[in-house]
Amino acid sequence: MSKEFEQISIKPGFMKHNGGVLFRAISENEYEFKSIINENHLNAAGITHGGYLSALIDAGAGTAAHRAAGNAPCVTISLDIKFIGGSKVGDEIIGHTKILKKNKYSCLFILWAKM
């Protein structure tokens, strides 16, 4: 699988506007994605906006599902996030996705992120 991260948000759109997402495959069912926090990602309190982190997680998980589905279009149906800490400018957020089950119509996975 790929050792280096690749930019996945190269088309115009929301994630490119927010700085893009770096992504790599660890195995057929495991993937990693990352982003480095900059000033555009901060909320009024000076920490990373939860909306940006949610979008990052959704993009990373969506790309993993897309790859696992043989590059078929995929959408997020449910996303549950628990924030347990804050991040700031310069922090690197790394997400890890592990696909637990997949079939023709759905993909179930667990995802966690750290800085």
Predicted regions and their residues:
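Terminal targeting signals and extreme-terminal segments of soluble enzymes
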Residues: M1-M115
